[in-house]
Every structure is written in structure tokens, then in C-alpha cells.
Regions:
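Accessory, non-ATPase domains that flank or precede helicase/AAA+ motor cores in DNA-metabolism machines
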Residues: 1-134
Length: 134
């Protein structure tokens, strides 16, 4: 399963990502805010604009996976996403650019912490720290 994700910060592109199998398919709803990897480990916030059964990428090209959902329910309704798409077409912009200028700063950023629980220790860190560990 794949998804078209609109980035909420520059470069504001709409990109295709694979949806991880650790969540059931019905969990990934359009309008959900997600954290996606961009470049060398940097995480960006994006909105799941549409789900796809198949990727439109050429053969041999692999998709990165969505890193993590940032909410459990969709942030944006279909009406708001349609409005953003229409405004983007009229202004010659990407939908993520429109949404990125409308949503509050806190929703355009990723502040994600990962916590590992092991039998011998409890370890907590931010995603930025995890990428430095690898």
C-alpha cells in the first residue's frame, strides 16, 4: 500500500511513500498527519492526501516508508483537502504549500520521541538522536 503525502514545509512537494505494515490498512486514513523521512534521516510533517494500491514509480525504484503517524485520527477533512487542492491549482502551488501556510506552526513540525523498553534498561530519545546512533 502506498500514499501521496503533501509536505507541510519547504519544498512543499507531494511525494509517494510506502505505508508500513505495522499498522492495519484501515488505520491509514486520508487527512492523517504523518512523519516522513526526507533526505538523510530528517523527518518532516506531511498530510496523507490519498492512498494508492500501487506506486506510480518506475520499476526498480523503491519507496521510503512513512516513519510514523502523528495522530490517530485524520487532522483534515475531505472538504479542507479539496479546498487546499483547488487553491493550489489556482495559485500554481503544491497543496502542501497552501496547508503549510494555513496550519499552526506546531502542526507543521515533527516532535517525535521513541522509547525502547528492554529487560535490562529503559532508553528514550528523539528521532534526531536515533539517526545519529545509526
Amino acid at each position: 500500500m502506498f500514499a501521496r503525502i503533501a509536505l507541510l514545509s519547504a519544498p512543499y512537494s507531494t511525494l509517494t511513500y510506502a505505508l508500513p505494515d505495522i499498522f492495519p490498512e484501515e488505520f491509514w486514513q486520508e487527512g492523517l498527519r504523518v512523519a516522513i523521512p526526507l533526505g538523510r534521516g530528517a523527518l518532516r510533517a506531511g498530510i496523507l492526501m490519498e492512498r494508492l494500491e500501487h506506486s506510480d514509480l518506475p520499476d526498480g525504484v523503491t519507496c521510503k516508508e512513512v516513519a510514523w503517524p502523528l495522530e490517530t485520527v485524520p487532522l483534515l477533512s475531505e472538504e479542507i483537502r479539496a479546498l487546499a487542492r483547488d487553491l493550489a491549482i489556482r495559485q500554481g502551488l503544491e497543496p502542501g504549500c497552501v496547508l503549510g501556510h494555513v496550519l499552526p506552526q506546531g502542526l507543521r513540525q515533527v516532535d517525535l520521541r521513541i522509547r525502547w523498553l528492554a529487560a535490562d534498561r529503559d532508553f528514550s530519545c528523539t528521532v534526531k538522536q536515533v539517526t545519529k546512533l545509526e
